[in-house]
Amino acid sequence: MSILTDEKLLADVAAGMSGHAIAKKYGMTPGNINRRIKRLGARGLGHGGNVSRFVPDGYKVKGTSSLVKPDGSVALQWVKTDVDAERQLKMMQEAIAALTECLSPLEEINLISRDEDTTLLNMYTVTDAHIGMLACEEEGGDDYDTNIAEHLISSWFKSATTLAPNATECLINLQGDFLHFDGLKAVTPTSGHILDSDTRFFKVVQTAIRVIKRAVNMCLEKHRKVTLLIATGNHDLASAVWLREMFKEVYCDNPRVTIVDEQSPYYAIEFGKVMIGVHHGHCSRMEKLDAVFASKFREIYGRTKFGYLHMGHYHHRKVAESNMFITEMHQTLAAKDEYSSNGGYDSGRSATVITYHRDYGEIGRISIPVEMIKDWYGLE
């Protein structure tokens, strides 16, 4: 039995033989034949090879459909393409290599604060920022878009780091739904509900990265140790993941910055005798959170005396105390979109920095309302 070369295989395919027929002819399995035909097609050979030059880079010819005249000539031809995963991976690697050529290391941020208190930790909580959301004053009482969100959140961090005590440590608690939508379509990731958006997704990504980096830099000037927690919300299920991974790489060589690396939507921080738990609020109800955290983080719960749980999701403030934890639901800085306005969901707008003592638990807080930020920084 003769050896099946690429030339023979191409000739048999051109003659109209099926994969099964070719396999029988050469004593091979049909799967083997089909894999070889696909590999040849990926190289622009065989069926559709004469049109492969018209296919964009990153794609390959999957097949062609031809309208043949009675005399055997081709009147029309349709080219069917598919993603060339190997080529697209190579293209992405080339793009990454090109981008990294012009990257320079982050400038070192020096600690400006003096007389720091090693017994304190400041927690800066911003929940439900919804960067990329569109809201208008006529409908919900105030305007909100990506540009407003960036200035509002950045100004809040500037105010909060100025007013808060000089604690040695801080926790930046971005408590979920930092981005309003999670991809190219402005819809919720799981239910597909249409969302009010004001811009393209790449601009939302750029803004989110700038805001987080700016917040970390401000905190590095004030605190010796900065912990960044990017919680997963129901609006940014995927984005929270890549944001965490990206900032892990950005600050991997900075011993003063720690990124909370937890893939479940429940997060716990231990500070002396204090346990701080964070969950966006989309997976567990408020009244259930204490049992979830006591079970999930048994060791931390057993070692600590004071327990505080924090959530968002509902955009209004509520506090409940059980035998195990004090659970707090936080307000948001974002304005009301059409959904919230039409549903009658009305609440105050603020964000809070809470100060914890490692031996005594919460000892102070500063709540900064949106109106105060607008007045201080001339925001409209």
Tell what function each PLM region has.
Residues 1-146, 162-166:
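Acidic, histidine-bearing metal-coordination/catalytic regions of metal-dependent phosphoesterases
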Residues 50, 220, 246-256, 261-265, ...:
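Conserved beta-sheet core of the metallophosphoesterase superfamily
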Residues 59-72, 213-230, 277, 307-310:
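N-terminal short leaders/motifs
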Residues 75, 239-241, 268-272:
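Short, solvent-exposed polar/charged micro-motifs at secondary-structure junctions
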Residues 103-114, 156, 289-300:
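Short, motif-level signal for alpha-helix interfacial/capping segments enriched in acidic residues
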Residues 108-129, 137, 142-257:
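Core catalytic region of metal-dependent phosphoesterases/phosphodiesterases
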